[in-house]
Amino acid sequence: MGKAIESAVKLTTGKYVCSCRARQRPCAHGLALVLMLKNAQERISVAQPPAWVRSVQLLAEKSAKPVTNVPAADDRFEERLALMTSGVEELEIRLLDIARRGIADTLAQGPDLFRAAAARLTDAKLPGPAGHLRRLANLGPDGTEAQIARALGDLYLFIRAWKHKEELSVKQHDELLQFAGMTTRKDDILRQPGLQDHWLVMGVVNGQEEKLRFRRVWLRGEKSRRFALLVDYAFGERPFERAWPLATSFDGKVHYYPGSYPQRTIFPQPVPGGRPYDGLVGYTSFTNMRANYQKALTFNPWLYSYPVYLQEVRPVKHDHDKVLLDTEGEVIHFHAGYQNFYTLLAISGGGPMSLFAEFDGYQLLPLSVVTGSGLVDG
């Protein structure tokens, strides 16, 4: 086994130090540290630096020139807001240009148009909207004009909200910054009261954007009946910090990120439940599901996905489409990338079934299914 890579970043000066052989700085290891700090602060703990870091600091202090007028944290925050505002203004120009050209003409220019716009937003410290544009670039030929129009509409709503952010409530302002990609410090979240409950792992989503892998884990509280979302990131092939197997349960407190309709949480000290989980009650009607989704949007219009537990629904073929049918005869389509329809059909045997899914306002992405032996991947 080779020697472990030693990598460190000094955030105040942007100095990267790494023992790898890469000639370019910052290297992949330094960038991975920055991405982890930005998107997965719960994976970072505060401790005294190891000896090799202190030796690097000592050498730097001996050779460093005096630094004056270091900007305070508030000044750096205002500088970032100014940079983000310039990115929002550029995004508005691009969206207005797309509106003039039309979606069909924009699509004819290929996905590089969206990728270039996403790169500019990333430079402006707006990774949230940049991710929306990258997903548009990755839709490929299966993407519809309706999907693109909706995504662009969400981005324009973000632009209008950003221009009037001073008029928003504190919670709405926090959610706007979270959508933009500005994360709340882990310590600040943990200082808020936690919600104690018995939590069941209902579904897991894994994905990747360039070399950064992400994971969404949905939990549901037995007593509170609230959903909690855990978001993890890992660079390259590195494993996630903790495993969250489907259908396992944990006792403990989750701490929600600030917001008027909070979903994302931190679960600092989960304890294996070791007992049955009770209390799953779901929608039998898509009408009721949509009504509650619309209520949620009135609190937080930036909901990327909405967790739903459905009962007495059936996967069927309807006019050559693969859909889900509720007790009232209403149908809803599956997510374009969903590939396990025939698995659902086999599990249901043509009869009613229960499943957990993410809903985006138009389509469902099943994540797990209830069987006689419990929850299984959907």
Can you say where each PLM-predicted feature lies in the sequence?
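Short Cys/His-based metal-binding microdomains
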Residues: K3-A60
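Long, compositionally biased intrinsically disordered terminal regions
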Residues: L121-E166, T183-K186, Q192-H198, G203-V205, ...
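Extended alpha-helical scaffolds
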Residues: A60-A180
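Conserved SAM-binding loop
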Residues: L219
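Hydrophobic, aromatic-enriched, well-ordered structural segments
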Residues: M1-L11, P193-L200
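A short catalytic or substrate-binding loop motif that flags glycine-/basic-rich loops and adjacent residues
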Residues: M1, Q208-R213
